């Protein structure tokens, strides 16, 4: 599954960047304005340092809004407001359930999933070879960060049976 494979590759790269505090970011030409509720404001304030370490640069902009000025390069092709909203929602949902390390893992998984190539997207031969090579350089090429299989074994018997033999 090309989406799961790319997600695994991105996840391991981003997690390594996070551990080394080297997440690449891109400044936004037009900062994204986000209106927040009181609960969202509290969760942003609580996890402000974590958001910065993940490459999400956010600044207070009035009493109930923030502006996002930088995002991880990983997310450059995604709508900033949508992804930041999803991250805030994930923080609200998991803040009390997850330990800090698990919360970081969850957010890196979310960002990797959103940035990964989509299932069914056409890849030329060079892209396929590159993706497979990157996948086999990961620590866990069998499963995506969500736990879904990337590679499955299909025996000759399974193929023959599906062909009515």
Predicted regions span which residues?
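Long, charged low-complexity intrinsically disordered regions
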Residues: 1-165
């Amino acid at each position: 599954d090309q989406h799961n494979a790319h997600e695994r590759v991105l996840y391991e790269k981003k997690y390594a960047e996070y551990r080394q505090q080297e997440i690449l970011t891109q400044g936004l030409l037009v900062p994204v304005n986000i209106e927040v509720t009181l609960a969202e404001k509290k969760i942003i304030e609580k996890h402000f340092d974590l958001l910065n370490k993940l490459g999400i640069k956010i600044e207070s902009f009035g009493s109930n809004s923030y502006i996002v000025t930088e995002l991880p390069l990983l997310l450059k092709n995604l709508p900033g407001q949508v992804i930041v909203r999803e991250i805030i929602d994930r923080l609200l949902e998991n803040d009390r359930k997850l330990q800090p390390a698990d919360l970081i893992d969850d957010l890196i998984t979310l960002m990797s999933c959103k940035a990964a190539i989509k299932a069914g997207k056409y890849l030329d031969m060079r892209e396929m070879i590159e993706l497979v090579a990157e996948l086999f350089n990961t620590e866990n090429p069998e499963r995506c960060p969500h736990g879904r299989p990337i590679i499955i074994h299909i025996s000759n018997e399974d193929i023959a049976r599906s062909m009515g033999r």
